[in-house]
Amino acid sequence: FVLPVSKELSVEYEAGEDEWIKLLPQGGNPNRIRVIAGWKPNDTTANGRRQEAKLIISNKIDGSGREEYTVVRRNWGLPVTYFNGVWWCKYNAKGNVKDFNDQVLSSDDPAVKVGKTLFDYLQTCTPEEFFELWKWEYQGDSGLGLQVIDDNGVVKLDGYDHNTSIHMNKLDPRLLAPDGFEIPSMEEYNRIFSSISGTIWLMWDGSHKTSWNGDTTIQRRQRRRNDVKIGTVELNDLIYISMYNNDHIDYEPIVWYGASAQWNNDGIYHGHYNNMLFTVYSPKGEGWYFTGSMKGLYSVVNGAGTKDTRIIRFKKSDVEYIYE
């Protein structure tokens, strides 16, 4: 907005509404104002509701001569945690990546509803609840989730296509995410997995260092589920791994969980079900993968190929204004 010197711009909200709009004077000129909308981490009201505010132009001297402009948006939110400079989503993607209704929403976070972190929730939730979160992977550019199924005793992804020729990691980072979110970059994954202190042995509790922010120590804790079943098959030793930085103790750990990648018609069992392959934004096609056996499970740089299925974990796209 560029206002006459006699005018001012203000914002009005209905009672109880968050102050989600910010007015920023530009170039030191109080009459040249940029209006931006903000984001609230873990907003428990962000269920797609209509969020409204009024921009008011009026005379500075007495508030008369009001002009009102109503601004409306749909307020959606996903649960997040702050880790090494990134607002990571807590949960893997589910269903249609573009559809908020398919995702775990910050207004309906199952872990928060029972007063737990996600790491603790995955220990105590029912096998059915665990499987519902764990079973989703993606392939190509459709953004439509593939679900783990029992195919006559073979655990595989329903709808797997061995002829897929699109490398997910080379796609635009916003293509496979809902509005306001995106696929984290290789550099952002490196802040967590690119160890400068040796191999990250994921099957054990421990710690490792990365070079992010000079020198960052990341603590690791792991747990297993042995009570999950799909059809006739028992899915034993399903690992989920908590990682946290002591510099961010106000935020809960990030938790890695999910099914092994599938790269042919033989399914997702590779001696176990924990060879997770992550969707990473990398024009070079790089990525991160949990490789090895359950006696030696570790993270490696591996972008894999076009036929491989991947777990999707969103991050919040950068924003200029965060409100509480």
Where are the model-predicted features located?
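Extended low-complexity, serine/threonine- and proline-enriched intrinsically disordered segments
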Residues: 1-22
